[in-house]
């Protein structure tokens, strides 16, 4: 029987900006380097910065047209929160044609997927594949709730639900104190780790005294990327650099905020103290090392 997709949304929309709300999910269109270089501080933030991701008893989603990723944050405190379907997806359920990576940066929590419970501790990662129908989130403690960061991409095939702790994520130390970029990289969802259709996901923790991430800078036009910064004290900030390597711009970021990086854009940053960040990619391939260098001395 041929499946009919229910069109539950409006037939015609008058798009007056690059971003709009469709129900409770924000939608953001993709823009190119020529448009981006002319944006002011506010418009840069509107297009690329994702704020207020971690709000108590709230599940927030932002849909980006860069490779159609969905960025999310879930903080269950007083109640269990359920991953909703959304009219924009034109699907029977959220993961009908999608996969989902979940990393917890808070207290211990539980993710229940089609009746199967996963205990997700701090800096553990859970992958849920295409076809997972029911997903819910809960915290073990109200005083120290879980902070679940979500990244979802379209998927064409099913892969099994899999969880990795940070110890299973093949931690690798990179950088040096002399260049203020000593860090530990944890790779969770990638070709040699948790398998997926197109989602690549992991995190980096900066060592004490190190503040520069993703040095040397690079781009990868085969994939877009999202950074989510965490572990940053309230009085500190991240200066996240983006844009064409010859037309760089910056966005000032606080703790628990995400930033969208277009495939053509550099993405690196410097904090006023050390911090951690989750990186996630989607696009043409799953090769973590596939990148085009943009050496520091060539940046403008």
What are these regions (language model features)?
Residues 7-86, 90-95, 99-100:
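Hydrophobic, proline/glycine-rich low-complexity stretches
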Residues 57-88, 182-225:
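A short glycine-rich, His/Asp/Glu-containing loop-to-beta-strand
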Residues 65-80, 89-115, 215-257:
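Glycine- and acidic-residue-biased ligand/ion/polar-headgroup-sensing regions
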Residues 76-77, 108, 133, 234, ...:
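Short, glycine-/Ser/Thr-/acidic-enriched flexible segments
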Residues 106-145, 151-154:
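Acidic, low-complexity central loop/insert segments
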Residues 120-140, 252-273, 280-282:
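Conserved metal-binding segment of the jelly-roll/cupin
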Residues 142-182, 278-300:
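Double-stranded beta-helix
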Residues 237-238, 249-250, 268-270, 286-289:
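Short active-site-adjacent structural elements
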